[in-house]
Amino acid sequence: MIIKKTILMTLFLLTSFFAAANIKLPHIIASRMVLQQKSECTLWGKADPNEQIKITASWGQTAQTTALQNGTWSVKISTPEYGGPYYIDFAGKNVLRISDVLIGEVWLVSGQTNMEIPMVGWPPYDTIQGGAQALAAADNDNIRFVMLQQKASFDLEEDNNCWWTKATPENCKPFSAMAYFYAKKLYEETGIPIGVIQCCWNGCNTESWIDLETVKTVPTLRNAVAEYERCKPLQKQLEDWVKSHKTITLNSDWRKRYDGVDFFDKEAARLSYADENWKEMELPCYMDNREGIGSFDGIVWFRKWVDIPIEWVGKKLILSLGPIDDMDITYVNGEKIGETLGDGKWNHSREYEIPAETVLSNEMVIAIRVIDCGNGGGLCGVKEALCIYPEGEEDKAINIAGKWKYLPTAEYKDGVFYSYDLKTREYYNRPEVPVVLNMKTISAAYNAMINPVKNYTICGVLVSMGESNVGRSTEYLKLFPALATSWRTAFKNPDMKFYFSQIAPYPYQAGESQCMREAQRRCQALIPNSGMVSVLDFGNRYGFHYAQKQQAAERFAAWALNDVYGKKCEVSGPEFSQMIIKGDKVFLIFSHVEGGLVCKGKHLTNFQVVDAKGVAYDAEAEINGNVISVWAQDCKSPKNVRYAYKDWVDDVTFYNGAGFPASSFTTEKKLIDTAEY
């Protein structure tokens, strides 16, 4: 589920050049970058101790500094009003020049998959509405972006392997669709060059993006902090052990990364391979935290002997495996029968044909190489989806869920696969660490992704996260403001704009998305200089990811255009502000009513009234000017109102005249982490 555009030769030359020089710059300070206009921007890097460094910018600014004893240096340089391109010279014992630098507006975008999904989407399920047309026209030298490498660390890191690029149809393919549409809208409205720092990681927990000292202020995470600090030295031992193994070389073309790759484990596919010493796992399941494997990213083989009816011998069969997170190459009796490779296929069901000539007896062995690059991993559907049957005779299917043999043969860390010896089952010698380092570990993404760029001057941030924290909504009232505090401290900008979107409706197993949306709604009042985007009307019943990235991006842009760029406009849907109860009716007053309150449908939907015992009744509602009256025939003494307060909402009709939907809300004061109302 990770997309990276790899330009290996360019990167090799770039890093080699810097490595050979006395002056060294972090990856984010490079040609094609965008610097924040009319600001005191920080430039920094490394040099020899006590080396004198002079910075000369072609817009007429200079600065001088001396490297400290540890070789680090930094300077402030004034930037003019937007324009360019410019160059900057760094002169010490050697001279470096970075060129094609624009002055404009810089935004950092961060979050989970809805912010990360690229312009090409993850078809066939996760597509971008209007994406193909927008991508074809995405040729704008004034929109530039840098994608930070997804990485987790226990230690504060100084650099992140990334590079700036310009918006072209090819370059934009792996770039965040939400971020591109946001930058496009800002540029169209202002004419100012836009730079975007993409800092996303699907499946991340919010606490992973917060620095450790700030995490310590969240009471519910104290035990996690203690465990984190205890395991930090153990993690170093594990990383050293993992990285002592040989690496698996992937293809340089990100679209064909895994095609024909040698994983050094093909023997595991053989019919005669001896797997009696492998451990067993019940499938289907996510591999995370299963006994014997824990939270693991990499390659895991699964094998199972299956008995089939004798009359099936010599017939074409269908093997159904359900969805596999992320990718797979599947074999039967040692012959490859199918594969699903590439990004965004983690929730795609697998059905492969077994050729008749492969079905030689009433016994067969199924071997699956699962490639997991993040999050849960494994055969993760329902039991009924794991089956085998003759073509056209699904009613005769034999279920193959249950115990499978398994063995991890490679581990994925920091974008690299490290191979474990298949013959010696080397994985079983892997050092154990109670806290697994990944995108869910407290402070891990902050350390490796935010800390390396915290000196870069930005205008503000866009955030779309919270899905991985569903079920912890009460905690989120402290956790999410802590994120804003952490980043404003890191970027040394206490008033930095902080715009965020709610999670979209989705039928979570626990039925708690409405609680998270309510926590996020309340966070807007807890975070100064923030703005919230409602995507209540973009829910996708079949996945977390919605297709309307352009519309969501333009809702984000409305906040920036109004707050930062002086384009006075509505920024939000109707926002509940006051409740008045008169008899059996409740009257709701709203702010953000530009163009009046609007019903986009035959009538307002999704309203409920709640009595003193907390019992909710479906209610009728009508608009009277900027007030909505709500009532239910079976509730004569209403005490509270809920709007769209359920995990799945698909009939949204409540908007303002500017076209923004209202957020779901409840007037109840207590936020409860449960779906049982």
Which stretches of residues belong to each language-model region?
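Non-catalytic, glycine-rich low-complexity segments
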Residues: 21-49, 99-109, 116, 282-296, ...
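Ser/Thr-rich low-complexity repeats and stalk/linker segments
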Residues: 22, 28-105, 376
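Beta-strand-rich ligand-recognition modules
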Residues: 60-83, 323, 331-384
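Short, aromatic- and glycine-rich surface loops/edge beta-strands on solvent-exposed regions
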Residues: 83-93, 365-368, 639-645
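An acidic-aromatic loop/edge-strand motif
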Residues: 96-166, 197-286, 360-446
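Catalytic cores of secreted or luminal carbohydrate-active enzymes
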Residues: 237-283, 518-589, 593-605
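Aromatic-lined ligand-binding clefts that engage carbohydrates, nucleic acids, or primary amines
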Residues: 278, 306, 312-334, 366-368
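C-terminal beta-sandwich/jelly-roll accessory domains of carbohydrate-active enzymes
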Residues: 587, 592-677
